[in-house]
Swiss-Prot record:
Gene (name only): ccmA
The protein's Enzyme Commission number: 7.6.2.5
Native species: Paramagnetospirillum magneticum (strain ATCC 700264 / AMB-1) (Magnetospirillum magneticum)
Record's protein name: Cytochrome c biogenesis ATP-binding export protein CcmA
Keyword ATP-binding tagged: yes
One of the GO biological process terms: cytochrome complex assembly
GO CC terms in record: plasma membrane
UniProt similarity note: Belongs to the ABC transporter superfamily. CcmA exporter (TC 3.A.1.107) family.
Keyword Metal-binding appears in the UniProt entry: no
Self-association state and partner proteins as the record states: The complex is composed of two ATP-binding proteins (CcmA) and two transmembrane proteins (CcmB).
Length: 217
């Protein structure tokens, strides 16, 4: 992965007429990580959607290598992997089929995508569940399937909303190792969490510090 930078300056978000946060900023370079902290309703999920390009900020600038994301939203979508707090596991597809769907969207080369899927299944302990349909999975198994998409369809920037939800300690350790390897390869991670997760050197952003009481002008 290239030596890139991802930055936000003076970001503000408005949802339903309410200013969720304002004046927010950060800067990440290759290998960097940012943990979003704050109570429910402080805007962690909204910020992740803004960073993914799924929600337009009310104010402020998002930039990749100094270039505004608004200048090339398709390029930003291609380098970003966003996982929301709801698991996007298709119930009628098997675990392997779910991952193949995402892998082929990322890489149309069937053999290469297949190898990525096999590696993702193995890494997240899903190989024995590969043929099981999504509707039969437990909450933890669905979460691991969702997280396995990160390896099946790799991208430089990972945006993760509460990735440890429904995971046991062993699965959290696997996730921590995967995050560390991604960062060591030059990738970036932004995640929200209510749980402890080991990401050495990660920055912290407390969203309640950017709450405002009045409407933006």
């Amino acid at each position: 992965m290239s030596d890139s930078t991802f930055s936000a300056k003076n970001l503000a978000c408005v949802r339903g007429g309410r200013v969720v946060f304002a004046g927010l900023g950060f800067s990440l370079s290759a290998g960097g990580a940012l943990v979003l902290l704050g109570p429910n309703g402080s805007g962690k999920s909204s910020l992740l959607r803004v960073l993914a390009g799924l929600l337009k900020p009310a104010h402020g600038l998002l930039a990749w290598n100094g270039e505004a994301l608004a200048e090339d939203p398709e390029a930003h979508a291609a380098r970003t992997h966003y996982l929301g707090h709801h698991d996007a596991v298709k119930p009628v597809l098997s675990v392997a089929e779910n991952l193949r769907f995402w892998a082929h969207l990322h890489d149309p080369h069937a053999e290469r995508a297949g190898r990525a899927v096999d590696a993702a299944l193995s890494r997240f302990g899903l190989a024995r569940l590969a043929t099981i349909p999504g509707k039969m999975l437990s909450a933890g198994q669905k979460r691991r399937t969702n997280l396995a998409r990160l390896l099946a369809a790799p991208s430089p920037l990972w945006l993760l909303d509460e990735p440890t939800t429904a995971l046991d300690k062993a699965s959290i350790k696997v996730l921590e190792d995967v995050l560390a390897e991604h960062r060591a390869a030059g990738g970036m991670v932004v995640l929200s969490t209510h749980a402890d997760i080991n990401m050495p050197g990660a920055q912290e952003l407390h969203l309640d510090q950017f709450a405002v009481a009045e409407e933006l002008p």
